[in-house]
Amino acid sequence: MPNFFKFHTVIERHWQKPYPVLSFLLKPLSGLFAKIAAKWRADFLSGKRQSEKLSVPVVVVGNIHAGGTGKTPIAAALVSGLQEKGVKVGIISRGYGRKSKAVYVLNAASRAEDAGDEPLLLFRKTGAPTAVGSSRVEAGRALLAAHPELELIVADDGLQHYALQRDVEIAVFPAADTGRTDLDLLPNGNLREPLSRLESVDAVVVGGRAADGFMPSEHLFGSRIEAGAVYRLNRPSEKLDISTLSGKRVAAVAGIARPQRFFDTLTHMGIRLDQTVALPDHADIFNRDLPPADVVLVTEKDAVKFSDGICTDNVWVLPVCAIIEPDLAEFVLERLEGVPKAV
């Protein structure tokens, strides 16, 4: 794992600031990937490959990047917005990082190893019925069988899962990439589909402030992340007074796509970090990963990975939420021509 993690770190740095030698080696592979990705989508659109439709409308929230776009808070905000408008909404996802590929409907006792960290976080934050499965179609069917009252399904990270027909497509795009001209497809870059794909989605949500002139879609939404009050993992009602951290050893642990963003957020909040630990995205967290510190800060996504066997008395969680403008939930319902009804 350490060697793979080191290699993956080099590649991720290359994606952000390309190394000429790596670009020379990887560019031909990106050209091949582009052809494969284009044919894959074309086969579904033409009917050469079979796609299936669920009995309720499906809204896909995904991206053309290989992770790290801040999609999960956007999906949570959309689901919450739909719930506030009275829509009975469910969530389906693949469930990266879990132990099984079988379809699984989440419940109050679900763990990250059963459902994956992101679906479990969405389930706990929104309370929306949630199912995971490598086949989004099967996950959707299982969810509707368990919750026939649902009127709409949000498919988390399903933009490239063309086997599932969708009624609305929403792509999340990081603000840091809105002004770049050196983006490329995998493996030379971190795009799963070309930028032109954004022209065919219903809406693009930019995570942060977009560069001037970035207008890939007629319907462009802005978003920002707001941090909530830090709470103790094993006693969520207990909040952390940041002013009390003076003189204490403080560490931060993150197993997300871009851990430095989490560390920077804590620093901007006025928290001095004595140690940071960056783990691979979706990685399990064990006692050995927690540094010796008076306070260990983690993300919400990592918090759901903690099991009963891990000492968590000194672990605190930073919750975040996405603010999307204008109203994305309202846009979705207008796109669907009113509140959908289950059949």
Swiss-Prot record:
Example of a GO biological process term: lipopolysaccharide core region biosynthetic process
Keywords for the protein's UniProt record, in alphabetical order: ATP-binding, Kinase, Lipid A biosynthesis, Lipid biosynthesis, Lipid metabolism, Nucleotide-binding, Transferase
Keyword Kinase set for record: yes
Pfam families: LpxK
Protein family per UniProt: Belongs to the LpxK family.
Known function: Transfers the gamma-phosphate of ATP to the 4'-position of a tetraacyldisaccharide 1-phosphate intermediate (termed DS-1-P) to form tetraacyldisaccharide 1,4'-bis-phosphate (lipid IVA).
Protein name per its UniProtKB record: Tetraacyldisaccharide 4'-kinase
